[in-house]
């Protein structure tokens, strides 16, 4: 029954997208201004420096990657027409010819070499760490690039579909220096015009774009509207045409609006309680398992997130090609939870502090977990702080637990298992260590075949879940709502807005 229900939920998500696309046929037109509403402003439009999902909504219009994604998040050629792994530590990329940056300079192998070396240069202070695997990059000829890697990995094409592969104009970046993130120059379908802080970002069509069928709009305006209620009101009133990340409480009402279309599908991320397994008693596996058994995930999903997602029993989402299936589901069991507390040496419960940032959903989840854990004698003291302070404590490892979200942006399981659960992972701030997990993830990184990698990731994810490394709560759906005049904007499981092919019905 659970397997059927999970399959049905995923099917319904896909059908929601199909339904949004089954609109009366309209002739594709050129021109017009698409107004995209989003709740947060980017920090930087330099792909090497930013971090947030909302930046990607803009970045993917300004820049192209060496590698791209199709609508199902399978890798496809972009600025690189093809690539070949010639040995375990070497890749050859053949580049697309005739591509121009928005400033009129040529995109070629020298530009790729400069971009990669810029990210690897410590002086750049890039937040992109995926390309640390690169030992050297060489321009073989004007449109051929060779990557030599420090270790064998089959993941380089996936890395180059993300921030590290978004190509910036070397000439513009050198000229603008630290101001480049406010005046970005790429090769994408739309070029930067202006950025009014906390108000809007304007782009216009790049008429020399190499993919002639991709840029139909005259302009794109990203309007920054921090209040979600105001954002939804603007969509209903026609002040914006498209909104990603629709508040779950508004989905049902928006679906009833005849002038709007709503897209919804399972996502790749998860809301979670990040546990610091380096401090007692959370360092005890049985204690962490007790907490996992005491959480009522389906109830939280229904009451807090209006059912817009699926319960989480581990870090790999159902929309991932490495998802193991309903066997990983974990029902609530208070009796077993209390037994596990006794096994962990705290039969009467214990107290721990839970860091909570300023995002409302973090607080809502934390309050629910606090009430549920109280039923097994565990006292959760909420420590409310600004998100920046929370991050500082997490980085310094001076915390016991934190309520947060992992935004799944890349469909490859390595992008969650390695940074969060490998002992050398970039974001493994909770001191989780399992040598077998390290071994499995390291082995999967060396392989090319997805079926071989899937087995290794599933085994690693099962170990992580059995260790109760964290409290995964639920995988939220990705959503979008738009005027029915908007066409050609697919919704992928990563939730990032891609406007190649977007057009407005007149």
Where are these regions (language model features)?
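Ligand-site clamp/hinge motif
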Residues: 207-253, 370-371, 379-381
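Append "and occasionally in soluble cytosolic enzymes with long acidic Gly/Pro-rich linkers
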Residues: 205, 256, 263, 282-371, ...
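N-terminal lobe/hinge region of extracytoplasmic solute-binding protein
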Residues: 37-87, 114-117, 185
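Ligand/substrate-recognition segments at binding pockets and active sites
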Residues: 197, 320-321, 342-409, 450, ...
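Surface-exposed binding/hinge segments that line
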Residues: 29, 84, 94, 128-172, ...
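Long beta-strand-rich cores associated with HINT superfamily self-processing modules
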Residues: 480-506
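Gly/Pro-rich hinge or "lid" segments in bacterial periplasmic/extracellular proteins
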Residues: 74, 161-215, 219, 227-229, ...
């Amino acid at each position: 029954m659970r397997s059927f229900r999970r399959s049905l939920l995923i099917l319904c998500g896909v059908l929601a997208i199909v339904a949004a696309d089954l609109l009366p046929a309209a002739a594709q037109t050129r021109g017009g201004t698409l107004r995209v509403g989003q709740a947060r402003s980017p920090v930087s439009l330099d792909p090497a420096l930013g971090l947030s999902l909302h930046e990607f909504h803009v970045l993917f219009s300004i820049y192209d990657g060496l590698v791209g994604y199709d609508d199902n998040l399978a890798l496809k050629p972009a600025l690189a027409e093809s690539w070949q792994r010639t040995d375990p530590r070497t890749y050859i990329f053949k580049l697309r010819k005739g591509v121009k940056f928005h400033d009129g300079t040529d995109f070629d192998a020298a530009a790729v070499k400069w971009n990669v070396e810029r990210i690897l240069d410590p002086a750049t202070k890039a937040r992109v760490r995926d390309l640390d695997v690169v030992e050297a990059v060489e321009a073989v000829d004007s449109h051929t690039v060779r990557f030599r890697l420090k270790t064998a990995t089959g993941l380089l094409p996936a890395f180059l579909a993300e921030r590290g592969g978004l190509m910036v104009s070397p000439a513009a970046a050198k000229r603008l220096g630290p101001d480049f993130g406010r005046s970005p120059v790429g090769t994408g379908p739309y070029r930067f015009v202006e950025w009014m802080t906390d108000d809007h970002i304007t782009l216009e069509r790049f008429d020399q774009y190499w993919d002639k069928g991709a840029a139909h709009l005259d302009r794109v305006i990203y309007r920054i509207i921090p209040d979600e209620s105001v954002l939804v009101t603007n969509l209903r009133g026609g002040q914006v045409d498209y909104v990603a990340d629709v508040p779950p409480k508004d989905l049902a009402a928006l679906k009833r609006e005849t002038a709007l279309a709503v897209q919804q599908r399972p996502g790749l991320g998860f809301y979670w309680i990040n546990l610091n397994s380096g401090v007692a008693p959370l360092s005890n596996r049985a204690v962490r398992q007790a907490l996992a058994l005491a959480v009522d995930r389906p109830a939280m999903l229904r009451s807090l997130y209006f059912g817009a997602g699926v319960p989480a029993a581990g870090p790999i989402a159902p929309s991932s090609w490495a998802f193991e299936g309903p066997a990983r589901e974990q029902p609530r069991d208070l009796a077993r939870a209390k037994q596990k507390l006794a096994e962990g040496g705290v039969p009467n419960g214990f107290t721990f502090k839970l860091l909570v940032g300023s995002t409302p959903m973090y607080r809502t989840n934390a309050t629910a977990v606090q009430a549920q854990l109280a039923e097994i004698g565990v006292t959760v003291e909420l420590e409310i702080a600004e998100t920046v302070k929370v991050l500082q404590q997490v980085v310094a490892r001076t915390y016991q637990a934190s309520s947060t979200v992992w935004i799944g942006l890349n469909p490859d399981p390595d992008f969650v298992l390695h940074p969060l659960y490998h002992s050398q992972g970039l974001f493994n701030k909770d001191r989780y260590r399992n040598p077998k997990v390290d071994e499995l993830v390291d082995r999967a990184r060396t392989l090319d075949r997805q079926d071989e990698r899937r087995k290794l990731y599933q085994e690693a994810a099962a170990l992580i879940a059995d260790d109760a490394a964290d409290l995964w709560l639920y995988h939220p759906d990705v959503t979008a709502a738009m005027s029915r005049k908007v066409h050609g904007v697919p919704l992928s499981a990563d939730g990032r807005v891609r406007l190649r092919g977007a057009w407005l019905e007149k």
